């Protein structure tokens, strides 16, 4: 991933940090390289935080911009997925990711209704 975009300095300038193996972007790259068939069958890739929100709201929850930058996949100048970092990570990655959204912009709905229907 790092070599594909021009080195650690480029990754750091784009995402705010160098690509460290434990970060999500490098882990996605590792998953793709180790098992391309399983990666191809993967429909959605979330962080735990956005996945839990998705379960609670019953829809795809966005990934916070700060979390996305910590994945080494969000550009800190545009606060959106960085196409060069995505392409260096795995093919068609953008299609597997939810949208990016600044923190503090919550969703007001949830999938779990605590009150049963009253008829």
Language-model-detected regions and their locations in the chain:
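Short alpha-helix plus adjacent loop in nuclease-associated cores
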Residues: 1-4
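Gly/Ser/Thr-rich active-site cleft segment
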Residues: 8-119
């Amino acid at each position: 991933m790092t070599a594909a975009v021009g080195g650690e300095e480029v990754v750091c300038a784009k995402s705010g940090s160098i690509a460290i193996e434990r970060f999500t972007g490098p882990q996605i790259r590792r998953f793709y390289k180790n098992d391309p068939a399983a990666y191809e069958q993967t429909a959605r890739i979330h962080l735990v935080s956005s996945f839990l929100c998705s379960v609670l709201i019953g829809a795809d929850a966005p990934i916070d911009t700060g979390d996305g930058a910590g994945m080494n996949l969000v550009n800190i100048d545009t606060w959106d997925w960085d196409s060069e970092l995505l392409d260096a990570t795995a093919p068609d990655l953008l299609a597997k990711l939810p949208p990016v959204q600044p923190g503090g912009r919550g969703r007001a709905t949830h999938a779990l209704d605590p009150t049963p229907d009253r008829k």
